[in-house]
Amino acid sequence: MKNVGIDIIEINRMQLKAKLIERYLSEEEAIQLQRLQSEVGKKQFLASRWALKEAIFKALPFEHLVFSEINITKNKYGQPTVKIKDYQISLSLSHNQTNVIAIAVIF
């Protein structure tokens, strides 16, 4: 059985507030965010992580997920990856200047 989750978010709606960052990003992701120079880049990064985690949450509706405990990384090809329990999860992420869309497929 496959479960699918999709999320889209407007980048400009992201607010770079400490409380929001602490709640939605893992420690590693928060460090990556701090290393980014531009506010636009930071908002895009936060929006991408938020959208990916929301898509995962929607695909796994019966799992108790804490967003700050989910760490999204990139594989050698630059694709987002995540490890949650024994699930096989495929992630896809795309964006333009205004929106980020994320898809999570659970196998």
Short names for language-model regions:
Residues M1-F107:
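Core catalytic alpha/beta fold that binds nucleotide/phospho-ligands
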